[in-house]
Amino acid sequence: MRVGVLGVQGSVKEHMDKLKLIKGIEAVEAKDKDTLLTLDALIIPGGESTAIGKILVDFGLKDAILKLNERKVPIWGTCAGMILMAKHIVNDERRHLGIMDITVRRNAYGSQINSFKTRLIIPAISENEIEAVFIRAPYIESVGDGVRILAKYEGKIVAAQQDNLLATAFHPELTDDLSFYRYFLRLNS
């Protein structure tokens, strides 16, 4: 299975390193539309959503990602990637990809200094607690009818799935746990 990490900004290397630990996965750093269109799954990493959103448009990557979504290729957005996938962003008129029926609040847990780690119980992902790293993290304020809530932290939605789309407010790539990767890769079957 050919799994790409959008290679324009953010935690690209960390996602690539995790994918390389999983048997049968060809990890690809996807920096152009031609590479994107060859993928069986795509991860949109954390970083700075405004900068990544601009790059998506300026380099024609947005259209390629929209084509992947039309083909129901699994797409997973972590932190900024989740913001890019959202149909609605609170207090922000921009809509980057707009492919997932969620409304997100950017930097909902505060600034960089307010970043934190916690442990979450997410039965759909693992029977064990999962470490979750939140860095200037967003959260999901509301979801549409077809969206499955996977995890909450202090009453706020921090992970969700809609068909082939997965979104996490936190960074599984910054932990030693591969549970979210295995769950995401099963969306392709």
Curated annotation (Swiss-Prot):
The active site is at C79 (nucleophile), H171 (charge relay system), E173 (charge relay system). Keywords: Glutamine amidotransferase, Hydrolase, Lyase, Pyridoxal phosphate. It comes from the Bacteria. Pathway: Cofactor biosynthesis; pyridoxal 5'-phosphate biosynthesis. Its EC number is 4.3.3.6, 3.5.1.2. It catalyses: aldehydo-D-ribose 5-phosphate + D-glyceraldehyde 3-phosphate + L-glutamine = pyridoxal 5'-phosphate + L-glutamate + phosphate + 3 H2O + H(+); L-glutamine + H2O = L-glutamate + NH4(+). L-glutamine binds at G47, E48, S49, R106, I135, R136. PROSITE patterns: PDXT_SNO_1, PDXT_SNO_2. One of its GO terms (cellular component) is glutaminase complex. GO terms for molecular function: glutaminase activity; pyridoxal 5'-phosphate synthase (glutamine hydrolysing) activity. It holds the Pfam family SNO. One of its GO terms (biological process) is pyridoxal phosphate biosynthetic process. Belongs to the glutaminase PdxT/SNO family. HAMAP family: PdxT (MF_01615). In the presence of PdxS, forms a dodecamer of heterodimers. Only shows activity in the heterodimer. Catalyzes the hydrolysis of glutamine to glutamate and ammonia as part of the biosynthesis of pyridoxal 5'-phosphate. The resulting ammonia molecule is channeled to the active site of PdxS. This is Pyridoxal 5'-phosphate synthase subunit PdxT. The gene is pdxT.
